[in-house]
Amino acid sequence: MTEDSYKKFIDIGFDDFKKFASDDSLSPNEKIGFPDSYRQGYDNHIIEDIESKLGEVRSGQEVLDIGPGCSNLAKAYIEKCYQSNSQITLVDSQEMLDLLPNMSNVIKVPGFYPSSDIMAKLNNEGGYDKIICYSVFHYLFIEANVWTFLDLTLNLLKPGGRFLLADIPNFSMRNRFFNSVKGAEFYNKFINSDKRNDNRKFDLHEDQIDDGVLIGMILRARNRGFHAYVMPQGDHLPMENRREDLLFVKP
């Protein structure tokens, strides 16, 4: 894909990803909104980072993956669950789910999370030991109610269960980084080599996630009786300098 082609990945949502899933001109990474350069060769590192926070999948555990997409990362995590003799439930559009393997340990639930019909199905499953939502929250932030999403997802955890809301683009973090010496060098090298990054303002658009959103979610979860943490990404991940994770634990 050319640089101009990536304009189609700006201001997108659930229905757009359904179309991407059916577009054979896109690679698996592009179908989920990523240039190949942002994901190729990183799958093992990402899984290691996930497991450092969620823990390794153990035999008999129930796992929920919200918005897995169709890339090799999703397939690798499904295989890891299979090898660990654990069941994984996948929630995404039918078009995306059709691109993922049908295996004995896989339950596919097509639809938009957290719609009422999806939640009715998931609430009948008895809860989950691990919930992962990777690189999806910034779309849900626009299309769903943040607090409803958080509350309903926390309700699905078993005692001792963990929910990792991961790979969140935090524009406060991004601005802090780009206004540092190292960040300015990164900006000039990878973002725009023709224009110096001299913006010292921490401007924020209404559809962007900042520190306030993430800290607010942490406080809400803690006030509901859950442990909650802001977690850095491993320095071997492609966007660790401007993305971070939230980890929620049910005592």
Segments the model singles out, each with a brief description of its role:
Residues 1-31:
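N-terminal, positively charged/glycine-rich alpha-helical extensions of SAM-dependent methyltransferases
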Residues 19-54:
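Class I SAM-dependent methyltransferase Rossmann-like catalytic core
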Residues 60-69:
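Conserved class I S-adenosyl-L-methionine
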Residues 69-117:
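Class I SAM-dependent methyltransferase SAM/SAH-binding core
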Residues 132:
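A conserved beta-strand element that flanks and buttresses the S-adenosyl-L-methionine
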Residues 140-152:
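A short, conserved alpha-helix within the catalytic core of class I
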Residues 160-168:
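Conserved beta-strand signature within the Rossmann-like core of class I S-adenosyl-L-methionine
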Residues 169-221, 232-235:
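C-terminal alpha-helical "lid/dimerization" subdomain adjacent to the S-adenosyl-L-methionine
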